């Protein structure tokens, strides 16, 4: 149930209580006083409804704008971002990386990479422990377990938690990503008793908080903006306002959905095998499962709408370029 629906239900409940109990049977006052007070209460509720109505309309307008303007990185932006966050190598120093030590570089690279490649929410990233990283018995399959944790060393005031039942999930890891994570665990993340994966790298090695992660992203954003100011220029329609964990998740969702749709289209031997609607539904279900959205969440549909709009615009431009008549 949305906030709007809850507030409407609350107003209805107030009116029900008044109708049921605002009478001489339950109130020890005169009928005249009952009537006068009821008028004042009704006027009060009416004023609150009007305020709520304005708030509700404003909220809908803002939400509509956001829906049509989900900010995510283009493929070029993603490639340039990875050039910024790539950790130093023994033979090659990354002068664009804003973090000075290799330990910080690898930790922060992995955080961005997991969000960008696997669609993790920031809270899910904060829940990861060293035991979240698993391999199969024959070591040919690797997984990341997304679940709640009860680490006794978690001192964070605002503790992260799983968003919904569907957010509990097992995500298959690329073998190279598994190696990066194990390198981090064995060489960097081996200094205290806590199992939390992403912590401060200085004593007392506290688990990273929401504000700590936002500060890391702000540092990366400043380096990104310095190297590529055009990406933040709002005169360009595909610019971004800022780089945040949610922008990474938006980017992952759109890229993943587009890949799934193209994959299912290519697998369809004949156009009669699967309709476009069937292909879209399969791709949306993949996105929903991988992203940990609940069955009634409309978020996957937002990305589908954007994909359809982008595809339609591309088709129209192709049509224009192929027209026989020219101006």
Stretch-by-stretch model annotation:
Residues 278-284, 289-318:
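Catalytic-site neighborhood detector that most strongly recognizes the C-terminal catalytic loop/helix
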Residues 1-38:
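Non-catalytic DNA-binding core/recognition domains of DNA-processing enzymes
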Residues 26-91:
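Flexible interdomain linker/hinge and immediately adjacent N-terminus
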Residues 156-182, 195-221, 241-245:
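C-terminal catalytic core of Y-nucleophile DNA break-rejoin enzymes
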Residues 214-289, 293:
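Short, basic (Lys/Arg/His-rich) helix/loop patches that form interaction surfaces
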Residues 20-23, 115-141:
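Short, charged phosphate-coordinating catalytic segments
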Residues 84-122:
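Basic, Lys/Arg- and aromatic-enriched nucleic-acid-binding interface segment
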Residues 89, 93-97, 127-180:
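Conserved tyrosine-mediated DNA breakage-rejoining catalytic core shared by Y-recombinases
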């Amino acid at each position: 149930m949305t906030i709007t629906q809850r507030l409407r239900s609350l107003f209805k409940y107030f009116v029900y209580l008044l109708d049921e109990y605002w009478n001489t049977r339950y109130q020890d006052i005169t009928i005249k006083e009952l009537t006068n007070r009821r008028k004042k209460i009704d006027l009060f509720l009416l004023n609150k409804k009007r305020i709520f109505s304005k708030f509700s309309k404003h909220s809908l307008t803002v939400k509509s704008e956001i829906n049509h303007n989900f900010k995510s990185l283009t493929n070029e932006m993603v490639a340039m971002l990875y050039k910024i966050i790539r950790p130093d190598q023994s033979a090659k120093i990354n002068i664009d990386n804003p973090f000075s030590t290799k330990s910080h570089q690898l930790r922060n690279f992995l955080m961005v990479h997991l969000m960008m490649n696997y669609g993790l929410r920031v809270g899910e990233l904060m829940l990861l422990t060293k035991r979240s990283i698993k391999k199969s018995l024959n070591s040919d399959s690797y997984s990341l377990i997304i679940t709640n944790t009860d680490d006794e060393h978690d001192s964070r005031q605002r503790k992260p938690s799983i968003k919904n039942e569907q957010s509990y999930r097992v995500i298959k890891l690329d073998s190279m990503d598994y190696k990066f994570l194990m390198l981090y665990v064995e060489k960097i993340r081996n200094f205290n008793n806590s199992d939390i994966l992403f912590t401060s790298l200085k004593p007392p090695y506290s688990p990273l908080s929401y504000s700590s992660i936002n500060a890391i992203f702000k540092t990366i954003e400043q380096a990104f903006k310095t190297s590529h100011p055009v990406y933040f220029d709002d005169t360009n329609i595909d610019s971004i306002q800022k780089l945040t964990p949610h922008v990474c998740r938006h980017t992952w969702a759109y890229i993943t959905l587009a890949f799934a749709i193209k994959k299912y289209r290519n697998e369809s031997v004949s156009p009669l095998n699967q309709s476009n609607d069937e292909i879209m539904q399969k791709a949306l279900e993949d996105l929903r499962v991988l992203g940990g959205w609940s069955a009634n969440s409309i978020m996957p549909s937002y990305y589908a709408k954007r994909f359809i709009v982008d595809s339609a615009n591309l088709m129209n431009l192709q049509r224009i370029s192929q027209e026989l008549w020219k101006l």
